[in-house]
């Protein structure tokens, strides 16, 4: 089954058709990444598009790697495997960055009970800087993308479809969601 809260869209577009044709000719060349979930079922961490293409191509089996991964390790692996894809939608980057940043903060450890708020902010800032370096974006741009997750779905779709400018959308994200409904 698919990874919970998977932020990347599997679209039946021209690129998918190209992938299906490639799979028909060559098979699936790169294994998908799976893990066992709490119900002892296989959960797809990475490879949702390859799996979909294989199904459309009529394949019944594909190569897979099964790893023992915590939730945070699975999130990091899923985002890392997908974030380098060309033409990611702003919404995909937004939720992927948000998920990975949260996982990185948890992996960095929670502050001790006697530490101040500044320590927690430092963990967040350092994690955002590390993420920015990993994906080739500025720390500020990571922050802007994550703000998009505060938009109502209708406005986020407008950003994805290039009908709402990115910077305007970031500004709108600070407005209460009930007010966003009126926009």
Enumerate the language-model features and the residues they cover.
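Generic structural signal of hydrophobic/aromatic residues within well-ordered alpha-helices
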Residues: 75, 79, 119-122, 155, ...
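A local structural micro-motif
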Residues: 31, 62-63, 140, 167, ...
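A short, Lys/Arg-enriched interface patch at domain edges and termini
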Residues: 174-183
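Charged, alpha-helix-enriched surfaces in structured cytosolic catalytic cores
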Residues: 11-14, 18, 48-49, 70, ...
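Amphipathic, non-transmembrane alpha-helical secondary structure
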Residues: 17-20, 98, 181
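Alpha-helical interaction elements
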Residues: 85-175
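Alpha-helical elements of the RecA-like P-loop NTPase motor core of helicases
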Residues: 52, 153, 181
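Short, charged/polar connector segments at secondary-structure boundaries
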Residues: 1-67, 73-87
